[in-house]
Amino acid sequence: MEKLSFEEGKFAVKFARINIECYLSGVHYVVDDLPPIFKKPRGVFTTLYTYPKRNLRGCIGIPEPVMPLIDALKEASISASVDDPRFPPVGRMELRDITIEISILTPPKLVEANSPADYLEKIKVGRDGLIIEYGTYRGLLLPQVPIEHNWDIGEYLANLCLKAGLPVDTWIKKKVNIYSFESQIFKELSPNGKIVEEK
């Protein structure tokens, strides 16, 4: 799948910040001159962190490529700031103390597994984001999450189950579907500051 250039990634982060600022101020934000890739369907997540402590402040996204990237980014950035049920809505002044991280996702693919041991072989920590599905339960973790928490593959899968509201060993004991995806990550180093691509 086509990757974003660094300039396109910077555009995504800047767009997310301005979009959130406008939403919190009651102003409608419209962009006329879009890079072509933003008109293509892509999955995307917006993650907000406090600065400088880098505590999670909100994270919501659209994992499937069901709408143009610009629309997914618009929806995910606003939702991360006001709709994450784990946190109160971000205040307009608070945004000055928040950094923004954008993850552009590849389409999720089913990890083919005949036994739970296959997951340990096929999933790579740091490369793969994961989605687990079991009945009506569903959970997602971005590829950067196990790196930030220093999890091994077993801990990653256990926490994926927890994210879905399932017991930690569900991936071993039940017939689950696990999907993997990769992401391209662009983030601010400080609020409204320098933007880098995480490699």
Curated annotation (Swiss-Prot):
It holds the Pfam family AMMECR1. InterPro entries: AMMECR1, AMMECR1_dom_sf, AMMECR1_domain, AMMECR1_N, AmmeMemoSam_A, Uncharacterised_MJ0810. Disulfide bonds: none annotated. Signal peptide: none annotated. Residues 7-197 form the AMMECR1 domain. This is Protein Maeo_0138. It comes from Methanococcus aeolicus (strain ATCC BAA-1280 / DSM 17508 / OCM 812 / Nankai-3).
